[in-house]
Amino acid sequence: VIAAMAGPAAPPVAGFVESAFNPLVHQAVERCLTAHPGDGSRTAMVLASTMGDATTLDLGSRRLVAGQVHNPLLFMQSTANAILGQLSRDFAVTGPLLCLSTVADLAGELLSTTELLLTDKELDRVVLIGVELAGTGRTTAAYRELRTIGPPAEDRAVALVIDRDDPHPHPRPPYGTPPTAYGTLRGLVELAARIQGTDRP
């Protein structure tokens, strides 16, 4: 199992504008797949996020309300499939690409999906990605309405690569981390820290 994280300093990705969401995903996955290259035809990628790319959605909505010309790049990147498509091209990944949303901790949902995908004998490994942006007024209100953990304190993405023969990791309760530190990424951040050998985020 390989793990990597990306934070607010993630470098930009050509063709993606304004939002940190896609650069975060790209950097975390790039770090994993560079450290652990493999057969892209037998690799799946699964991305999970509670709020998705709220920056792009909010910016596009504000421009629409203001009567401004719509930016086609914002339309293109408004779904998380866009950055998965970019990564599949960069790393020749031709297996399934999936995007999920859950209001609970993302780790359990991603690991359950990985187990299901690896029942397919044509797949050998799965790249798991969790990503959340720091809260805005709108998303913080949405988290309250959903009665879920809430947004992370800063933009963050976590990626793991799990091979078929790896012992499948299991999340465990975080080490007293304040809920606002990592939001719905808490389980993934703690799991990545264990895999990296630091045992603490």
Mark where each language-model region is.
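Conserved "HGTGT" condensation-loop signature of ketosynthase/thiolase-family condensing enzymes
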Residues: V1-L74, S78-G108, S112, L116-D120, ...
